[in-house]
């Protein structure tokens, strides 16, 4: 945000309760060997496996587990409200089935229980600018192209079981995404 936002809101007596930090980094700047090594160590030490999907049907079978883990991993946040079954079904139909299954990653323990998940999506910003707000006659092609062939991605959602937090599980997830992209 622009710096004057803070002054404007503080003038009216408002204060910041939470701060949001966004980080952008280039994949070419990432040391992939580090993530591969850490991923291997964390998998061995904690008896974990990554789950990669090739079809939306496979993802849909396990989305209820994912949303249960989402509720569990975000429960301690002050402003979090649990997702109920009706909302789970809505999100499955509205969002999950439109995400490329390669962009959804799970980590499971030796009992095949999901202990972590992450969802990334391609950035549609450039495609939306290119189509100039017009979906038809050919604007939708820009969206389809961006969905399949995109160099920019956004990490939309990540959740880790509280019992597995601070064990390096994110190294498994990020290594899996690095290999996918």
Predicted ranges, named:
Residues 1-52:
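Acyl-donor-binding surface of acyltransferase catalytic domains
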Residues 33, 128-130, 165:
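Short acidic, gly/pro-rich beta-turn/loop elements at beta-sheet edges
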Residues 52-160, 175:
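A conserved beta-strand-loop-helix scaffold within acyl/acetyltransferase catalytic domains
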Residues 164-176:
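Conserved acetyl-CoA pyrophosphate-binding loop and the N-cap/start of the following alpha-helix
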């Amino acid at each position: 945000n622009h710096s004057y936002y803070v002054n404007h809101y503080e003038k009216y007596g408002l204060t910041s309760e939470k701060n949001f930090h966004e980080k952008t980094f280039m994949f070419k700047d990432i040391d992939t060997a580090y993530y591969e090594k850490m991923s291997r160590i964390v998998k061995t030490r904690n008896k974990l496996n990554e789950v990669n999907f090739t079809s939306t049907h496979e993802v849909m079978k396990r989305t209820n587990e994912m949303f249960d883990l989402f509720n569990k991993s975000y429960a301690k946040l002050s402003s979090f409200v649990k997702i109920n079954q009706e909302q789970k079904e809505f999100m499955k139909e509205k969002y999950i089935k439109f995400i490329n299954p390669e962009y959804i990653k799970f980590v499971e323990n030796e009992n095949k229980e999901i202990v972590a998940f992450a969802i990334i999506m391609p950035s549609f910003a450039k495609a939306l600018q290119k189509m100039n707000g017009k979906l038809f006659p050919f604007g939708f092609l820009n969206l389809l192209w961006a969905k399949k062939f995109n160099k920019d991605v956004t990490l939309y959602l990540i959740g880790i079981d509280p019992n597995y937090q601070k064990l390096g599980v994110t190294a498994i997830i990020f290594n899996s995404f690095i290999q996918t992209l």
